[in-house]
Amino acid sequence: MVSYKAFLITLAAVTRVLTYPANSSFELVDRSGTPSSTGTSGGYYYSFWTDGGADVTYTNGAGGEYKLQWSGNGNLVGGKGWNPGSAKAVTYSGTYSPNGNSYLSLYGWTTSPLIEYYVVENFGTYDPSTGATLKGTVVSDGATYKIYQTQRVNQPSIIGTATFYQYWSVRQTKRTGGTVTTGNHFNAWKALGMNMGTFDYMIVATEGYFSSGSSDITVGSSTGGGDSGSPTSAPTTSPTTSPGGTCGALYSQCGGTGFTGSQCCASGTCKYANSYYSQCL
């Protein structure tokens, strides 16, 4: 005869079996989508990172193209470029459609010192300069960029959790496509005491934070996708006396095809950027 206690144990076991369906695959869905990864694709270095909180799909296309689509909670950043980075004229084109907090930027890292840097070309509803320290401005590639510095304490980095500075150049007229002359920003940062170290990777990146959106970006450069040379400084032009006898202030234009203003610098030296533009840095 089965005891009452044994009957209750058997009934409880049957109840547990009936409570959970045999097919419970819905519990195993990976909401993060594409996992974090780095590597090469189409002759370019790529980096994609996510904290796993968002629904995100990152896809490498041919050559310098990549596509990114995301939504939901979480942080993610991905794109194509070079490893190591360097001072070069980076070209990019495509589409960028953010909804919320997101950046489209030339993005990278250096070590010794550990620096995370952004040249922000476009952004969503949140201005990345919020709460940052304004250091100055630089004129490059047809626009003014405001320069900021922030510090990150015990945050994720390319060497693990660390404390480091972030350098920002934020374009004041948003765009999606054009040329980013990285050396102009590196030189301007240096002139402001914002020193960089040894270059790690450098990409044209899309970043999203608790937001949604999509991007389809193609990256290139004047030196080709495979270039990974050492950082170089722009040539220096010798100062000359201006027609009016007054030299330009720091960050002002001091040369270029068709330029008729002052060709000397009261502060800094006249640095050549391209045939159309030189600047006091």
Curated annotation (Swiss-Prot):
Functional summary from the UniProt entry: Endo-1,4-beta-xylanase involved in the hydrolysis of xylan, a major structural heterogeneous polysaccharide found in plant biomass representing the second most abundant polysaccharide in the biosphere, after cellulose. May act as an elicitor of plant defense responses in certain plants but does not exhibit any cell death when transiently expressed in N.benthamiana.
Pfam families xrefs: CBM_1 (PF00734), Glyco_hydro_11 (PF00457)
GO cellular component annotations of the record: extracellular region
TM region(s), chain numbering: none
Entry similarity comment: Belongs to the glycosyl hydrolase 11 (cellulase G) family.
Active site residues per record: E116, E207
Reaction(s) the record says it catalyses: Endohydrolysis of (1->4)-beta-D-xylosidic linkages in xylans
Gene Ontology terms, MF aspect: cellulose binding; endo-1,4-beta-xylanase activity
Protein name according to UniProt: Ethylene-inducing xylanase 1
GO BP annotations listed: xylan catabolic process
Glycosylation site positions: N23
EC number: 3.2.1.8
Gene name for this UniProt entry: EIX1
Ranges for domain GH11: 32-220
InterPro entries: CBD_sf (IPR035971), Cellulose-bd_dom_fun (IPR000254), ConA-like_dom_sf (IPR013320), GH11/12 (IPR013319), GH11_AS_1 (IPR018208), GH11_AS_2 (IPR033119), GH11_dom (IPR033123), Glyco_hydro_11 (IPR001137)
Keywords: Carbohydrate metabolism, Glycoprotein, Glycosidase, Hydrolase, Polysaccharide degradation, Signal, Xylan degradation
SUPFAM superfamilies named in the record: Cellulose-binding domain, Concanavalin A-like lectins/glucanases
Domain CBM1, residue spans: 246-281
Organism, scientific name: Botryotinia fuckeliana (strain B05.10) (Noble rot fungus)
Pathway annotation from the record: Glycan degradation; xylan degradation
Span of the signal peptide: 1-19
